[in-house]
């Protein structure tokens, strides 16, 4: 995280020197099962646990002189408000539906996998053990947007850089894009689904929405959305590329946003 944030900081400073009006948004992803489990192991609440981590991150940013225009926390009230509006809209228009998830789950990556996606029975992203999971869940119709995603990559050749990573995502889509699990009933540490509160939002829908919630989309706290969106650049680690280049643009397509 320090590596990626430092690279973003350098780019933000360079663009400011060129005269651009820059909005640099580092963030912390604070919900999910691994946070809940680690907090329990330490004997503190999940909120206390993430508050301590965030304090350390902010101290590190000061030490390294890393700038930020707005520090985003996914536990912030305005972000929760935005996520609930986004989830409700996607459900009401039919892009989110209720089903049952049965398969494999990697807790460190917070990712669900089918049998065919595992590598030697382990998570294809991190190589760790997975465990069997079965629960009622809501799903986002990612598969509905497969053709539009491929066309996006073709029409905007530099949408994903470097080229090798773009080719990975194209291959992933062409092997058959599955709908994405977007809620949990077994993880209370998350944003409640407003119309079905026994469910909490799965962490990726929550986390990805921060890019627009931090600009005021779906809330009254900020009003920078029209000025700064769409973003000129997302700088992300290779381990979360799939979520940012497949799930996130598919969500934006569903919302009718650029």
Residue ranges and their predicted role:
Residues 1-96, 110, 151, 251:
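N-terminal Rossmann-like or analogous alpha/beta NTP/dinucleotide-binding catalytic cores
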Residues 1-26, 73, 78-82, 108, ...:
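Structured secondary-structure scaffolds
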Residues 89, 105, 112, 122, ...:
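The −1 position to Zn-ligating cysteines in a subset of zinc-ribbon hairpins
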Residues 96-100, 130-131:
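A short alpha-helix-loop-beta-strand transition element characteristic
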Residues 102, 119-120:
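Short metal-coordination and nucleic-acid-contact micro-motifs, chiefly zinc-binding Cys/His arrays
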Residues 113, 129-130:
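Cys/His-rich microdomains that often coordinate metals
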Residues 120-121, 135:
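Predominantly a Rossmann-like dinucleotide-binding segment in NAD(P)-dependent oxidoreductases
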């Amino acid at each position: 995280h320090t590596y990626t944030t430092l690279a973003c900081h350098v780019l933000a400073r360079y663009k400011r020197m060129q005269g651009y009006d820059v909005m640099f948004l580092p963030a912390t992803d604070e919900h999910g099962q691994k946070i809940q489990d680690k907090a329990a192991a330490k004997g503190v609440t999940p909120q206390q646990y993430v508050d301590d981590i965030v304090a350390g991150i902010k101290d590190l940013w000061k030490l390294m002189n890393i700038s930020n225009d707005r520090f985003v926390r996914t536990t912030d009230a305005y972000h929760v408000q935005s996520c609930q509006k986004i989830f409700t809209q996607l459900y009401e228009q039919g892009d989110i539906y209720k089903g049952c998830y049965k398969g494999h789950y990697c807790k460190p990556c917070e990712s669900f996998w089918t049998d065919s996606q595992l590598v030697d029975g382990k998570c294809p992203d991190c190589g760790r053990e997975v465990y069997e999971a079965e629960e009622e869940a809501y799903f986002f119709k990612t598969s509905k947007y497969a053709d539009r995603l491929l066309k996006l990559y073709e029409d905007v050749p530099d949408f994903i850089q470097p080229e090798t990573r773009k080719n990975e995502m194209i291959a992933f889509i062409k092997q058959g894009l599955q709908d994405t699990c977007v809620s949990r009933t077994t993880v209370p540490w998350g944003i409640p689904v407003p119309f079905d509160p026994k469910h909490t939002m799965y962490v990726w829908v929550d986390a990805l929405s921060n890019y627009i919630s931090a600009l005021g989309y779906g809330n009254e706290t900020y009003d920078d959305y029209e000025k700064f969106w769409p973003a000129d650049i997302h700088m992300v680690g290779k381990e979360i590329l799939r979520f940012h280049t497949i799930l996130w643009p598919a969500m934006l397509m569903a919302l009718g946003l650029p």
